[in-house]
C-alpha cells in the first residue's frame, strides 16, 4: 500500500479535487460533514450494496457506536438520512465533546472536587457523613461533582467563581449551542412532511420530555419512554391529557438565548425572550472574534479559561502542556459532562430536566468510486476499523475507538493512571452525541451567513439575537428550500 500524506488544512478540498478527476485514490478519509456532498457528487462507492462482505453494516450486534455508523448514511435521491439510507464510509473513530475544567482552580477556591455518580451518591454521603446534593456544582456546600452534569445556572455560578482567580479572564468557553438546544429537544433545522427543511433556530414553541416516573406515553402514533424528548413532528399533537405525563421544557429560541448570553457583557441585553422579557448577558465567556487565531486550549493551558468545551483530540496536548508542566502538574485538569437543562425544588432536588446532549466529530474511511482496487481497499478499511487497528490508534489517547468494548477497556482507552482520570465521561458522551449542524445537509451554505453574523457580531455584543433573525431568517429559509427543490 502507498500512503500519501496531505496537509490537514487543505485535505478535504484537495481530496475532493482528486475524486473529481480520472486518477482517483483508492481509500480516502472523509469527515462526517463532507460525506453527504461527496456521496451526492458520486465520488464514493456504496459499502452496503452487496459488493463488500465481512462487516456488520447494520450494526446488528451493536459492536460499533450507532452514531458512528449512522452519520455516514445518506440517500442522494431524497437528500435525507436514515437507517435504510446507503452507507458510504465506516468510522475510523468518534470524538465526543466534554467539559474540560481546571482542577487546580477548584483547589485554590476551596471547592471540594468529588467524582461520584448520582446512583452512588447516597452511599457516599452515608460513608462520609456528608449530605451532598445531586448537583454538578453545589454552591451552598462548595462541592463540584465531575460525574453529574451541571445545570445552566450552575455553569454560570462556577464560571464566576473561577474568574476570581488571578489570571482567569473567563470561567467558561463554549463555541457550540448544541448542548443547549438539543438538551431541551430543539434543533436548528427540521425536515417537514411537505418535503422541505425548515429553519427552526428561532422556534418559540415549548418542548416536552416524558416524566421519569412514567412508563411510556404515545403521541401522534409514536411511543416515548421515560426521559425521552417529544419530537418536533409530534409536539403539536400533545394534548392536555398527555401533559400529565410530560414536563415542559424551554423553546429552542430561549435555549439559544441562554447560549448567546454567555459571551454578552454582564447585564447587557442579548435579546427578547419568547415571553417578551429582556435576556441579560452573563459575561463569563469570550466570543470567537475575540479569540482570534488562538485555540481555546491555548487559553486553558495559560489559565485564562477556567473551563472549556472541546473533544477528545485535546487530550494529548493537555497531557503534554499541563500534566507534564512545572506550572500545573498531574491532576491539574479533568473532564466532566456537558451542562444539561435542570430545574430544582427548594430542597435542591431535580424536578425537571432536559436530555444529555452534545455533538461529536468523526473521521470515516471510504472507497473512491473510481478505484479499480475496491476489494483490496475494503480489506484495509476492515483492518483499520477492526479490533487490531482500533487498539493501535487508541493507545495515543487521541480519539475514542469506534468499538464500544474497546472504549471501556482500561489499558486501551480509559487510561485512568493518566489525566484525565474521569475519562469515562467521553465514553458516556459517545452514547448520545451526534454530528453538528454542518452534517445536516450536503453543504453548509445555509449556515455560513447567519453563523458568521452570530459569531462575529452577535456574540461580540454588537447586535442582538432578534436582529440576527430579522436579518437572516428569510434568506436562510430560501436556501433551505433549494436543497429539496421546494
Task: List each language-model region with its residue ranges.
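C-terminal capping/gating helix-and-loop segments adjacent to ligand/active sites or protein-protein/ligand interfaces
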Residues: 418-478
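Beta->alpha turn/N-cap motifs
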Residues: 30-34, 174-177, 293, 310-315, ...
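Glycine-rich, aromatic-lined ligand/substrate-binding cores of catalytic
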Residues: 259-264, 292-314, 366
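Hydrophobic residues within well-ordered alpha-helices
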Residues: 15, 155, 162, 299-301
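Mature extracytoplasmic/periplasmic domains
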Residues: 44, 312-325, 338-342, 358-359, ...
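Glycine-centered hinge/linker elements that transmit conformational signals in sensory
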Residues: 154-159, 194-293, 338
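Extracytoplasmic "Venus flytrap"/periplasmic binding protein-like
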Residues: 2-73, 108-109, 299, 306-307, ...
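Hinge/lid segment of periplasmic solute-binding proteins
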Residues: 32-97, 116-128, 212-216, 334-338, ...
Amino acid at each position: 500500500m502507498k500512503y500519501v500524506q496531505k496537509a490537514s488544512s487543505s485535505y478535504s478540498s484537495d481530496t475532493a479535487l482528486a475524486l473529481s478527476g480520472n486518477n482517483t485514490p483508492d481509500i480516502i478519509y472523509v469527515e462526517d460533514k463532507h460525506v453527504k456532498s461527496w456521496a451526492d457528487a458520486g465520488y464514493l462507492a456504496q459499502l452496503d450494496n452487496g459488493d463488500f462482505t465481512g462487516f456488520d453494516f447494520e450494526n446488528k450486534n451493536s459492536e460499533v457506536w450507532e452514531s458512528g455508523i449512522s452519520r455516514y448514511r445518506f440517500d442522494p435521491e431524497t437528500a435525507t438520512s436514515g437507517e435504510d439510507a446507503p452507507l458510504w464510509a465506516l468510522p475510523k473513530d468518534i470524538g465526543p465533546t466534554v467539559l474540560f475544567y481546571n482542577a487546580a482552580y477548584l483547589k485554590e477556591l476551596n471547592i471540594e472536587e468529588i467524582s461520584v455518580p448520582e446512583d452512588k451518591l447516597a452511599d457516599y454521603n452515608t460513608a462520609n457523613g456528608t449530605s451532598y446534593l445531586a448537583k454538578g456544582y453545589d454552591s451552598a456546600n462548595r462541592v463540584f461533582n465531575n460525574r453529574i452534569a451541571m445545570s445552566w445556572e450552575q455553569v454560570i455560578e462556577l464560571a464566576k467563581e473561577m474568574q476570581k482567580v488571578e489570571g482567569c479572564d473567563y470561567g467558561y468557553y463554549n463555541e457550540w449551542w448544541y448542548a443547549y438546544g438539543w438538551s431541551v429537544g430543539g434543533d436548528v433545522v427540521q425536515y417537514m412532511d411537505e418535503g422541505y427543511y425548515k429553519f427552526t433556530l428561532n422556534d418559540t414553541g415549548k418542548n416536552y420530555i416524558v416524566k421519569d416516573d412514567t412508563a411510556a406515553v404515545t403521541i401522534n402514533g409514536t411511543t416515548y419512554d421515560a426521559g425521552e424528548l417529544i419530537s418536533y413532528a409530534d409536539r403539536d399533537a400533545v394534548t392536555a391529557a398527555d401533559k400529565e405525563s410530560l414536563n415542559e421544557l424551554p423553546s429552542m429560541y430561549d435555549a439559544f438565548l441562554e447560549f448567546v448570553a454567555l459571551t454578552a457583557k454582564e447585564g447587557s441585553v442579548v435579546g427578547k425572550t419568547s415571553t417578551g422579557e429582556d435576556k441579560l448577558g452573563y459575561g463569563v465567556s469570550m466570543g470567537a472574534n475575540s479569540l482570534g487565531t488562538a485555540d481555546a486550549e491555548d487559553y486553558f493551558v495559560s489559565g485564562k479559561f477556567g473551563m472549556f468545551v472541546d473533544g477528545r483530540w485535546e487530550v494529548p496536548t493537555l497531557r503534554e502542556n499541563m500534566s507534564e508542566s512545572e506550572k500545573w502538574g498531574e491532576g491539574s485538569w479533568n473532564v466532566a459532562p456537558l451542562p444539561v437543562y435542570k430545574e430544582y425544588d427548594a430542597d435542591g432536588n431535580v424536578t425537571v430536566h432536559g436530555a444529555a446532549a452534545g455533538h461529536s466529530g468523526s473521521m470515516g474511511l471510504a472507497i473512491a468510486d473510481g478505484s479499480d482496487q475496491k476489494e483490496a481497499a475494503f480489506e484495509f478499511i476492515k483492518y483499520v476499523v477492526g479490533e487490531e487497528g482500533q487498539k493501535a490508534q487508541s493507545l495515543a489517547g487521541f480519539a475514542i475507538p469506534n468499538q464500544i468494548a474497546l472504549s471501556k477497556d482500561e489499558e486501551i482507552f480509559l487510561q485512568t493512571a493518566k489525566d484525565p482520570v474521569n475519562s469515562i465521561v467521553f465514553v458516556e458522551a459517545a452514547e448520545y452525541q451526534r454530528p453538528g449542524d454542518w452534517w445536516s445537509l450536503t453543504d453548509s451554505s445555509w449556515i455560513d451567513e447567519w453563523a458568521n453574523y452570530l459569531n462575529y457580531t452577535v456574540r461580540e455584543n454588537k447586535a442582538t439575537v432578534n436582529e440576527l433573525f430579522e436579518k437572516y431568517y428569510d434568506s436562510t429559509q430560501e436556501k433551505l428550500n433549494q436543497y429539496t427543490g421546494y
